[in-house]
């Protein structure tokens, strides 16, 4: 027995709510994945601020209809799709999906959408290869710390150099 019109409307509203909170959407071909494997993917995504939603393409089409941010997904809505919606740390969620795909060798990323731009598989891999936000902040902090250290050494070196020059000049004057 199929879903009622009311339950379909609820699903569309739920998807709209999830999309409103999401920063990125990935479309995966999940054909051939077992329930256990889908559960594994979902648990990996929970740890990295992502959610995996399996729904009919027609319901997703209704959810993105009229929404300029997500309308680019329209071209990916064919076949058996699972939708990964990511809020926050996009890189860690992409790494979780890629690690899952590498282990199972059953799922394939069709594409994605980030900030209204349709992404290819290569672009998604490039984003996943970027360091996490925490790693970037640590690199910036390290760079700033080294700059301040160099400035402090340089500022300290000026009076020391002057003192050495004066001492040498005084020794030369005495001779």
UniProtKB/Swiss-Prot annotation:
GO terms for cellular component: ribonucleoprotein complex; ribosome. The keyword Ribonucleoprotein applies. One of its GO terms (biological process) is translation. It comes from the Bacteria. One of its GO terms (molecular function) is large ribosomal subunit rRNA binding. The keyword Heme does not apply. Pfam families: Ribosomal_L10. Keywords: Ribonucleoprotein, Ribosomal protein, RNA-binding, rRNA-binding. Forms part of the ribosomal stalk, playing a central role in the interaction of the ribosome with GTP-bound translation factors. HAMAP family: Ribosomal_uL10 (MF_00362). NCBIfam families: PRK00099.1-1. Part of the ribosomal stalk of the 50S ribosomal subunit. The N-terminus interacts with L11 and the large rRNA to form the base of the stalk. The C-terminus forms an elongated spine to which L12 dimers bind in a sequential fashion forming a multimeric L10(L12)X complex. Belongs to the universal ribosomal protein uL10 family. This is Large ribosomal subunit protein uL10. The lineage of its organism: Bacteria, Bacillati, Cyanobacteriota, Cyanophyceae, Synechococcales.
